[in-house]
Amino acid sequence: MATETLPELKKVLLNEDGQTALALRFRALFSLKDMGEKGDNGAIDVIAEGFKDDSELLKHELAYVLGQTKNFHAVKPLQGVLADTNQQAMVRHEAAEALGALGDKGSVAMLQEYFENDPLEVIRETCELALERIKWENSEAAKTETLQKSAYTSIDPAPPLPTDQAEGSDKATVEKLQKTLMDKSQSLFHRYRAMFRLRDIGTEDAVLALATGFDDSSALFRHEIAYVFGQMSDPASVPALIKVLGKTEEEGMVRHEAAEALGSIATDDVLPILKKFAEDKDQVVRESAIVALDMYEYENSNEVEYAH
């Protein structure tokens, strides 16, 4: 990472000259994230200033990043975004998820209110997950469960199921997890736990099991499947992701996540698909494809890390 100062990164992230490409703004954001993780509250404040932007994609990423910093200075701006009904649903959802990722017990009352009363399903479901995550994090189970050490550093909306509930990575375990993944009689949180256990198993069978999640009725659930595929970066998920991205009737939050996932997989067959959807009429899909193309170039270059 280049050693830009906070004012320089702020200038790029907030597009102060009006001419900064979105992909560069994303790179500045990831540099600011590193600073925020190390306790730099000024970096958190700069990220929070970005919520005034027009780009739904950028704002949702700002919220996601704030949730990953483990920095409680981010709580207040995230609460403000969740409460702001003028913000796009995808941005508000990401703010609620970020409050869950931070594990902020002080946000429980607010999350409960929006879980019970928000008119949008995606917000209600996200608040449900955030509440369950905070509850789990402060439970005995969090101390006693044996979780597989994950290859991923992200703070997820739910922890994976413990290994004693889904041991090994054989076909039978994957089939059992797939049934849990799609079992509507289970809580959303429990189904997410099955999702992240499948991610951590990481076999091709696990990828194919996860792909069945695209048939779920919840847009939030479908978008999380695409997000997980982006983390796994397994070429076996490409056909399912291309199919989702090509469904113009699908929710933008799902299609955009599919575009980003394809960018992180970065196989040769992905490039023409991303170029096509960089012209999509849905702004969040279009911008995601443009950022994904930048990620594709990075994945196929010798750059050390994706940051400004």
Swiss-Prot record:
Keywords: Cytoplasm, Hypusine biosynthesis, Iron, Metal-binding, Monooxygenase, Nucleus, Oxidoreductase, Repeat. Pfam families: HEAT_2. HEAT-like PBS-type repeats lie at residues 91-117, 221-247, 254-280. Fe cation 2 binds at residues 223-224, 256-257. Binds 2 Fe(2+) ions per subunit. It is found in: Cytoplasm; Nucleus. Its main location: cytoplasm. Its cofactor is Fe(2+). Catalyzes the hydroxylation of the N(6)-(4-aminobutyl)-L-lysine intermediate to form hypusine, an essential post-translational modification only found in mature eIF-5A factor. This is Deoxyhypusine hydroxylase. The lineage of its organism: Eukaryota, Fungi, Dikarya, Ascomycota, Saccharomycotina.
